[in-house]
UniProtKB/Swiss-Prot annotation:
Keyword check for Glycoprotein: no
Originating organism: Mycobacterium bovis (strain ATCC BAA-935 / AF2122/97)
Subcellular location: Cell membrane
Presence of the UniProt keyword Repeat in the record: no
Keywords from the named record: Cell membrane, Membrane, Transmembrane, Transmembrane helix
Protein known as: Uncharacterized PPE family protein PPE45
SUPFAM superfamilies (alphabetical): PE/PPE dimer-like
Length: 408
């Protein structure tokens, strides 16, 4: 637009009629806020990706995620920079307006000049107002030139400030064929576990055996066959998992429990004396055989007791009781109560000391620490209450110390 052909009334009127620089400053603040949010989002993405791929996540899925999200993070950073630049240019446009506004002649001054000219012309009967009319016209010409210069400068500054870099749309980070690819990956991932699952029953059968060497050999062979077929990414995933502290602690606890069940006590341990660390472990499914008590109808062949595991004599029919029998009016009396006939026989189950392992006394347990469990617990009688032998004490007893000699 050629602002030189427009009178000062139009140029000054346009400059003073607008809303001013307020909208441009508000736009600059909005662009700055958008730039800050985009920058924070890009930084959060970078931090999350670095933490995931740096210590906890590796493999094809991690690589695919990084490849998909990297363009998006770059777009966020570039858009944040463009938004910040837009805010700066909005401030530049506001500054250009303020400068042009200061250079523009106020409309009241222009109106006063025109009113003075009309008055001088109206009273110029004998030519006495000719010099004043010329001066008034000269002032008006200066106003014209000043407004035109201000508008030309403002137009140039505004054109530079409004030259923004075009914004681009966010990149597409998903694949249209992702669902089909995921279905194919699911089908392919179910094939290898079928072969692995087929070996589980065999391993469980070997685990139920008391022999450790075949079980260890089979487990070692199974691990070798399966681990050697892993891809480098899968091996890297296993290595990363083994590097996590809580994963190692969990494996250590699992191995310790297996060792506690697999390793019996020392054959020559003192049992309840606790002279050996291994004496505190056992009994397990791998515990050696021991002699079971003689059972009616079996257990001893030719006067020699047959070695049986611990659980055999724990399920002794004689200890548990015979067949079920009942009769009417045959109950025994315990004071004013009627009790079953075998009440006295069953009372031995209430006293742990009355039901003992093979042998006549507690010393029969000594020397068998290789298959004992938590030896050394004292046996307490359950036939009588010992609560009356204790006296309840409340509060606390104060200890009074004498004044030491060095205290004076």
């Amino acid at each position: 637009m050629d602002f030189g052909v427009l009178p000062p009334e139009i140029n000054s009127g346009r400059m003073y009629a607008g809303p001013g620089s307020g909208p441009m400053m508000a736009a600059a603040a909005a662009w700055d806020s958008l730039a800050a949010e985009l920058g924070l989002a890009a930084g959060g993405y970078r931090l999350a990706i670095s933490e995931l791929t740096g210590a906890y996540w590796a493999g094809p899925a991690a690589a695919s995620m990084v490849a998909a999200v990297t363009p998006y993070v770059a777009w966020l950073s570039a858009t944040a920079g463009q938004a910040e630049q837009a805010g700066m240019q909005a401030r530049a446009a506001a500054a250009a307006y303020e400068l042009a506004f200061a250079m523009t002649v106020p409309p009241p001054v222009v109106v006063a000049n025109r009113a003075l000219l009309v008055a001088l012309v109206a009273t110029n009967f004998f030519g006495q107002n000719t010099p004043a009319i010329a001066a008034t016209e000269a002032q008006y010409a200066e106003m014209w030139a000043q407004d035109a210069a201000a508008m030309y400068a403002y137009a140039g500054s505004a054109a530079i400030a409004t030259e923004l870099t075009p914004f681009t749309a966010a990149p597409v980070t998903t694949s249209p064929a992702a669902l089909a690819g995921q279905a194919a990956a699911t089908v392919s991932s179910t094939v290898p576990p079928l072969a692995t699952t087929a070996a589980v029953p065999q391993l469980l059968q070997q685990l139920s055996s008391t022999s450790l060497i075949p079980w260890y050999s089979a487990l070692q062979q199974w691990l070798a066959e399966n681990l050697l077929g892993l891809t480098p990414d899968n091996r890297m995933t296993i290595v990363r998992l083994l590097g996590i502290s809580y994963f190692d602690e969990g494996l250590l606890q699992f191995e310790a429990s297996l060792a506690q069940q697999a390793i019996p006590g020392t054959p020559g341990g003192a049992g309840d004396s606790g002279s050996s660390v291994l004496d505190s472990w056992g009994p397990t499914i791998f515990a050696g055989p021991r002699a079971s008590p003689s059972v009616a109808g079996g257990g001893a062949v030719g006067g020699v007791q047959t070695p049986q595991p611990y659980w055999y004599w724990a399920l002794d029919r004689e200890s548990i009781g015979g067949s079920v029998s009942a009769a009417l009016g045959k109950g025994s009396s315990a004071g004013s109560l009627s009790v079953p006939p075998d009440w006295a026989a069953r009372a031995r189950w209430a006293n742990p000391a009355a039901w003992r392992l093979p042998g006549d006394d507690v010393t029969a347990l000594r020397g068998t620490a290789e298959n004992a469990l938590l030896r050394g617990f004292p046996m307490a009688s359950a036939g009588q209450s010992t609560g009356g032998g204790f006296v309840h004490k409340y509060g606390f007893r104060l200890a009074v110390m004498q004044r030491p000699p060095f205290a004076g």
